[in-house]
Amino acid sequence: TYGMVIDYKSGGAHVTAQDVYYGLKLQLMTYLLALESAYGNTQGQSMAPAAVVYSYVKNPKIPAGAPLSYEDAVALAKESDAWHNSGYFSDDIELLTHIDNKFLSYGAKRGPYVPIATKKDQTISSRDLHKVKNTGEFDVMCRYTNHVMADIGRNIGDGQFPIQPYQLNKNRPCTYCDYNTVCRFDSSRN
């Protein structure tokens, strides 16, 4: 049995392994942990992940006139990466064809539901290998997410709220934070 987490977003959300490692984006993996736990508790068996993705809910500007056919909608989706799901997918090619039955027909162009390019031999293109995970890799990411969440919970329980915003390259969340006057984080000293 396989499960898939889909988090619908109106903006351009994406996740990287670095985001998960630094605890910046735990949402998809947290949802996967909850899904696996709920499935195990209700069904009495384990579930393997098929994918964890952000799916964009857009209201694209489409010329007025006749309704779009499925083929035309797919053509529009192919033209815009903004319509593509973003996240992690199983490395099982057959499973990916169950998510999108036309997955293999997109080849190097990537489809909207499984935006992973394939080579002529129907294996995953090297440029998209970072988007696929085997069951063990999903498990490691879930266990790590669980560990980070447990640490956060312990810190909250202990009354520990250190002012330690992340810095990734030169980016900090403080730039856009409405509460920087409350926390008094001074980037010139820290």
Regions found by a protein language model. Give the residues of each.
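Structural signature of nuclease core domains in nucleic-acid processing machines
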Residues: 1-190
